[in-house]
Regions:
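Nucleotide phosphate-binding/pyrophosphate-handling subdomain across enzymes
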Residues: 57, 135, 143-260, 284
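Hydrophobic alpha-helical packing residues
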Residues: 5-9, 286, 332
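Phosphate-binding loop of NTP-binding sites
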Residues: 1-96, 102-113, 165, 227-228
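Beta-strand->loop->alpha-helix junctions that form or flank phosphate-binding loops
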Residues: 18-22, 112-133, 152-158, 182-186, ...
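P-loop/Walker A phosphate-binding loop and immediately adjacent motor/lid segment at beta-alpha junctions
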Residues: 76, 84-92, 112, 219-228, ...
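A glycine-rich beta-strand to alpha-helix segment
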Residues: 302-333
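Short internal beta-strands
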Residues: 93-98, 234-237, 258-268
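C-terminal helical cap/extension that packs against the catalytic core
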Residues: 252-313
Length: 340
C-alpha cells in the first residue's frame, strides 16, 4: 500500500520522501529522499512504535491478531489502533478499509475526520466490476455514488485492489486528478518479495512472496489462482515460534488454494524455541483439516531436491515466508536450468 501511494504521489509531481518496507522494483531500494513536502512511511505496529508518529494522513488497511507477544491481547492491540487513528491533526484524515471488520470497529470511536474504501456500497471510495486478466486487474472506481472511471493495475489479487483504492483515497485527498492517479497506478511495477516473479525454467514459474500471516498467505494464493490456470505448489517457512503458536489454527486453514503444500522448519528470527511449537504440528494439522497433498521437509537445504520430484511442466511454485525461503525458489530455478 505504501509503495503504491508513494508511486502515485511521485507521478503527480509531488516528489515525496518515501520509506517503504520492501524494495520498489522501479527504484531498487526501499527509501528515497524527495524534495516535496510529503513523507510516505510504512508504520510498524509490531512494538507499538507507530504511536510515536504524527501523521497528517493515516491509512489503516487491516488489523489482524498479530504481535500479541507485545500487546498481550487483541483488546490492547485495538486500543493502540484507536490511538493511532485519532492522532491526526484537525485538518488531517484517517483512511480506513471498511471491509475489514476490525478496522470498521474503529469508526464509532473516531474523533477526527476519516474516509473509507472497500467493496462495500457504504465505502466512500468503492471498487466495482473487478476483472482479473492474467497479471493485470481492472476495476471501476465509485466515489460516493459517482463513477470516477476505470483503473488498471499490473498485478493480480483482491488485496491489490484494496491497496490501490487506499492510494486513490490518499491522492484524492491531496486534490490529485483522477487521470493522474490512474496513470500513476498503471505505472506501478511492484515491490520485491511481494508476489515477485523470480523466473521460469522447464515450464515451471517461480514466484516469491513475503506473506507469513495466514491472511497474507490466503491473499497470495488467491491472487495466483486469479492470474494463472495452473497447479499451485506453496512452499512455506513459518516465521517465529510465537506467531506459529498464536495463529496456529488460522494457519491450518490458509492453504486450501494450493494444490500442494511443502513445509519446512520454523525461521526463528531471533526467538528462542517454544516447547511443543513445531512445524511438524502444522504439517499434521493441515492434513487433518482436509488438505490432500502436504509435505514436511525439516532441512530446508533439501527442499529443492524434493521439489524436483514434485514439480511438472506448467506448475507454479510460490515460496512464502519472511525468512530466507526465497533461496529455495532461486535454487529450484537454477537446478531446472541445469546450472547446479
Amino acid at each position: 500500500t505504501t509503495s503504491m501511494i508513494a508511486t502515485v504521489l511521485a507521478h503527480g509531481g509531488m516528489d515525496p520522501t518515501m520509506v517503504v518496507g520492501g524494495k520498489l522494483n522501479s527504484l531498487g531500494t526501499n527509501a528515497k529522499l524527495g524534495q516535496g513536502e510529503f513523507i510516505v512511511a510504512e508504520a510498524d505496529e509490531s512494538d507499538g512504535s507507530f504511536l510515536m508518529l504524527s501523521p497528517t494522513i493515516s491509512v489503516i488497511t487491516n488489523i489482524d491478531p498479530e504481535h500479541l507477544d507485545h500487546y498481550g491481547s487483541m483488546d490492547r492491540l485495538m486500543e493502540a489502533f484507536h490511538q493511532f487513528a485519532n492522532k491526526i491533526p484537525f485538518y488531517g484524515l484517517s483512511i480506513l478499509c471498511l471491509d475489514h471488520l476490525n478496522v470498521q470497529a474503529l469508526i464509532p470511536n473516531m474523533k477526527k475526520r476519516y474516509a473509507t474504501y472497500g467493496l462495500s456500497a457504504q465505502a466512500d471510495f468503492q471498487a466495482r466490476d473487478i476483472e482479473y486478466d492474467g497479471l493485470k486487474t481492472h476495476y471501476t472506481v465509485i466515489h460516493k455514488g459517482k463513477k470516477l472511471g476505470k483503473i488498471t493495475i499490473r498485478m493480480p489479487g483482491l488485496h491489490n485492489v484494496y491497496n490501490s483504492l487506499a492510494a486513490i483515497t490518499v491522492a484524492s485527498e491531496l486534490d490529485m486528478g483522477f487521470s493522474t492517479i490512474k496513470e500513476g497506478l498503471a505505472s506501478f511495477s511492484g515491490v520485491q518479495r511481494r508476489f515477485q516473479i523470480k523466473g521460469e525454467a522447464g515450464g515451471v514459474t517461480v514466484v516469491d512472496d513475503y506473506g507469513h500471516h495466514p491472511e497474507e498467505i490466503k491473499a497470495t494464493l488467491s491472487a495466483a489462482r486469479n492470474a494463472w490456470d495452473r497447479r499451485v505448489i506453496a512452499v512455506f517457512q513459518p516465521h517465529r515460534y510465537s506467531r506459529t503458536r498464536d495463529l496456529f489454527d488460522d494457519f491450518l486453514k490458509a492453504f486450501y488454494q494450493a494444490d500442494t503444500v511443502v513445509l519446512t522448519d520454523i525461521y526463528a528470527a531471533g526467538e528462542e524455541p517454544i516447547p511443543d511449537v513445531k512445524a511438524e504440528n502444522l504439517y499434521e494439522g493441515i492434513k487433518e483439516h482436509g488438505h490432500r497433498d502436504v509435505h514436511f521437509i525439516a532441512d530446508k537445504e533439501k527442499i529443492t531436491s524434493e521439489l524436483l520430484n514434485i514439480v511438472k511442466e506448467g506448475d507454479l511454485v510460490i515460496t512464502l515466508g519472511a525468512g530466507d525461503i526465497w533461496k529455495a525458489g532461486e535454487e529450484l530455478l537454477d537446478r531446472l536450468k541445469g546450472n547446479k
